[in-house]
């Protein structure tokens, strides 16, 4: 297991900027609005050949509102989980009451943690002089840095990583986890789903749409298979995104889909499927990802023995050509079908990466063609000679024929349905290419 480094501090001291500086990418959302990073956000990093996990947190804030209290709880959980804590302060703002409270908490309650006291935004000679006052706080000797410009960050990382032993396992560790993007419109229950699976309040859950702003990775193991759950801010209509933060969050959702193996598209059972839901599903299909539709809050629906069947029939009538996407009725609150959803997603991932030998495919083709005759066009008959699978991240099949222009839509659909039925390719897009031979 890679060592975990947590960035903690009050809102807007530059935690996300330092997070991005260390990882050399724009990963956490950076904005001058306090509280932009609400949840614990974890990413893998490397410095001087040593690998680690870096955790960005929502700011430590003693305000009494619901979100601030939840952010405080997340900060405390981050400290408990971490091997090393970077306590970040802001030289421009000086030491605040929150800084002193957090510092005392770290020294009193978490004295066994390895602590690095860091003063950020030291970007001018005058600010360097101002930073000297932080030495008298009684905390560990501070590091003076500028996360924005990068000054002092390398020296800080050298000292932090110096104490982290590198194991052979760490060097040889390979990524074999199945990546699942939990996506959907705001407030459909994505974070509750992740929290129920992980058994801890990993993400801030609130009935306020948009509570989860970043895409946040969580790892867990089920039946000896490692999974990475990517929880995202809900995708809203572009017309409703009236601020930069919401734009970045929606962009993060799209990127989460791009890097996942299977998209878990979550709907609220009450309103049912809407245009924006279809947009999200199509986003996964266009990127050739596996897809699973989760109908959440099923426990709140009045139902009888036929309700789920009627609901699914209505749902599929609005889904057009996406009948291959499986549907599961779940409840993040009662945990109904939660683990079945993960098992189904694992099967979809396996379907997506399945390799079928050419001999098996051509035996299938011979059997399929014995039940139908390809239609003719302009008096010319389509003749398929053989087929094979092309190496790709999803099932791509090449059919070699006398004239690709003779292939009509109904015959293409016939072959797709037969392929899905015969090889159990549920939940994954199929590409078929007809080539002249």
From Swiss-Prot:
Domain EngA-type G: 3-168, 178-353
Residue positions binding GTP 1: 9-16, 56-60, 120-123
Keyword field contains Repeat: yes
Molecular function terms, GO-annotated: GTP binding; ribosome binding
Keywords, alphabetical: GTP-binding, Nucleotide-binding, Repeat, Ribosome biogenesis
Binding annotation for GTP 2: 184-191, 231-235, 296-299
Sequence ranges assigned to domain KH-like in this UniProt record: 354-437
InterPro entries: G_ENGA, GTP-bd, GTPase_Der, KH_dom-like, KH_dom-like_a/b, P-loop_NTPase, Small_GTP-bd
Entry's Gene Ontology BP terms: ribosome biogenesis
Alphabetical list of Pfam families matching this protein: KH_dom-like, MMR_HSR1
Family: Belongs to the TRAFAC class TrmE-Era-EngA-EngB-Septin-like GTPase superfamily. EngA (Der) GTPase family.
Function statement: GTPase that plays an essential role in the late steps of ribosome biogenesis.
Oligomer and partners: Associates with the 50S ribosomal subunit.
NCBIfam families in the record: GTPase_EngA, small_GTP
PANTHER family per the UniProt record, alphabetical: GTPASE DER
Protein name as annotated: GTPase Der
Protein source organism: Pelodictyon phaeoclathratiforme (strain DSM 5477 / BU-1)
